[in-house]
C-alpha cells in the first residue's frame, strides 16, 4: 500500500469504509469476477474490515469514559444500587 493510499484510508469515515466493503461484497457475490480481480477485492475488503474494526474499538474506548464535573475524563462504571431488601 502506498503512503497516499494509507493516508486516504486513515481519513476515511466508518460509513465510507462500510459502504466500500458492501460494494466489494456485492461484486464478489455476483460471481463474474476473474480470480485475480477477486483476490484484489478480497484484500481491499480485508483492509476496510480492519479499518472498521479499529474505528469501532476507538469509539468503544471513548464510550468507556465520561466527563467529570471538572472536565477531566474518568472511567465510567455502573454500580448496582442497594435496594435495601435484605
UniProtKB/Swiss-Prot annotation:
InterPro entries named in the record: Exonuc_VII_S (IPR003761), Exonuc_VII_ssu_sf (IPR037004)
Main location (coarse class): cytoplasm
Regions crossing the membrane: none
Disulfides per UniProt: none
Superkingdom of origin: Bacteria
EC number(s) per entry: 3.1.11.6
GO biological process: DNA catabolic process
Enzyme class name: hydrolase
Subcellular location(s) per record: Cytoplasm
Reaction catalysis annotation: Exonucleolytic cleavage in either 5'- to 3'- or 3'- to 5'-direction to yield nucleoside 5'-phosphates
SUPFAM superfamilies the record matches: XseB-like
GO CC annotations on file: cytosol; exodeoxyribonuclease VII complex
Molecular functions (GO terms): exodeoxyribonuclease VII activity
Keywords linked to the UniProt accession: Cytoplasm, Exonuclease, Hydrolase, Nuclease
Family stated for the protein in its record: Belongs to the XseB family.
Matches recorded under NCBIfam families: PRK14063.1, xseB
PANTHER family for the chain: EXODEOXYRIBONUCLEASE 7 SMALL SUBUNIT
Function as written in the Swiss-Prot or TrEMBL entry: Bidirectionally degrades single-stranded DNA into large acid-insoluble oligonucleotides, which are then degraded further into small acid-soluble oligonucleotides.
Description of how the protein assembles with itself and partners: Heterooligomer composed of large and small subunits.
UniProt-recorded name of the protein: Exodeoxyribonuclease 7 small subunit
Organism the protein comes from: Bacillus pumilus (strain SAFR-032)
Amino acid at each position: 500500500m502506498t503512503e497516499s493510499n494509507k493516508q486516504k484510508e486513515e481519513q476515511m469515515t466508518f460509513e465510507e469504509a462500510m459502504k466500500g466493503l458492501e460494494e466489494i461484497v456485492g461484486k464478489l457475490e455476483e460471481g463474474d469476477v476473474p480470480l485475480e480481480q477477486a483476490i484484489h477485492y478480497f484484500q481491499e475488503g480485508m483492509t476496510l474490515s480492519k479499518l472498521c474494526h479499529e474505528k469501532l474499538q476507538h469509539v468503544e474506548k471513548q464510550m468507556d469514559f465520561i466527563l467529570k464535573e471538572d472536565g477531566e475524563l474518568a472511567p465510567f462504571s455502573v454500580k448496582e444500587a442497594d435496594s435495601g431488601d435484605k
